[in-house]
Amino acid sequence: MMDLTAYIDRIPSAGETSRGTEFTTGFGGKGANQAVMAAIAGAKTYFIGCIGNDLFGAGIMQNFQNRGVETKYLQESHRATGVAHIWVEANGENRIIIIPGANLEIDKSAAVSAIHEIPNLDIVIGQCEIKQEITLAAFKAAKARGATTILNPAPFENLSAELIAHSDWIIPNESEFAALGNIDANILLTEGDKGVRHLNSGKQVAALKVTAIDTTGAGDSFVGSFASKLNEGVDVAMRFGCIAAGLSVTRKGAQSSYPTYEEISTFS
C-alpha cells in the first residue's frame, strides 16, 4: 500500500477545515511494513500480496527489491494499488483509513502455492488487510510445513474461530485486544509507550524512553523485528522488537522511519 500522510497540529472537528504542516507519500501497508522490517533485521523475507498495474504498484515493487524483500509472489491486479490516508497530530498519534484496492484480489491458490514453495519456511505473518479466508488458507499450509504463524489483527475485524486456532501468536494493540474479547490464544499485547506484554506468561518489556513524533508503522516494526528474532527465544525477540519500535517513533513515516540493524543492536 501507499501511505498518504498529512501532519497537523490538531485533528479538525466535523465540518471544520484546518491547515496542515506537511504532506508526504511513502511506502506502507501493514504486511509490507512488517516484511521490510524483518528484512532489515536480517531475515530472508518473501512477500505474498497484490498490487495494481499503476505507478504506486511499480514503486512498491521497486521498494521491495531495494529493501531486500523477495517479490516472486507479488501478484498484479487490474484494481488500483491500496492506499492508506493517515493523519498525524503534533503528539505523534495517528488516525488511519485504508482503501484496500488490489489487496482484495490476492488469489488463494497462488498464496497457498507460495507457502508450499518458499524454501526453509520458518514463520508466516498475516494481517487483516486481505480477505480472512486467504490468511487462513496460508496459515493452514504453513502449519502443515511446521512453520510458526503470527497474526496481527489489524485493521480489526472479527476473527473466525478457525483462524484463531491456526495462529500460534496473535499480536494486537490495546484497541484491537479490547475488541477481540475473551479468546483462548497466545497473545502478545503491544501497549504503545508502555511496551509489550505476553499475556500468557506475564513477561513484559518496557518501551524505550523517547519523544515520539510519529507513531505510524511502529506496531508493524515490532511485529517484523519480533518475528525475525523468535528463533532466539521469546525474551530476545520481545526486547529486539521494542527497541525497533521505540526508535521508529522518533522519525516520520512508516518504513522510512525504521532503524537499521546496527542501530537496534546498539540498544540490545
Regions found by a protein language model. Give the residues of each.
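Beta-strand->loop->alpha-helix junctions that form or flank phosphate-binding loops
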Residues: E22, I48-N53, K72-T81, A154, ...
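Ribokinase/PfkB-type carbohydrate-kinase core domain
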Residues: Q62-E76, I86-Q204
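Conserved phosphate-binding/catalytic region of the ribokinase-like
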Residues: L180-S268
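Gly/Ala-rich phosphate-binding loop of Rossmann-like dinucleotide-binding domains
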Residues: A39-I40, K143, N231
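Aromatic/hydrophobic pocket-lining residues that form π-stacking "cages" and hydrophobic walls in ligand
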Residues: Q34, I60, A137-K140, A244
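Short, conserved phosphate/pyrophosphate- and ester-handling motifs at nucleotide-, phospho-/glycolipid
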Residues: A38, N173, G219
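Glycine-rich phosphate/adenosyl-contacting loop at the front of the ribokinase-like
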Residues: M1-C50, L55-G59, A212-I213, K252
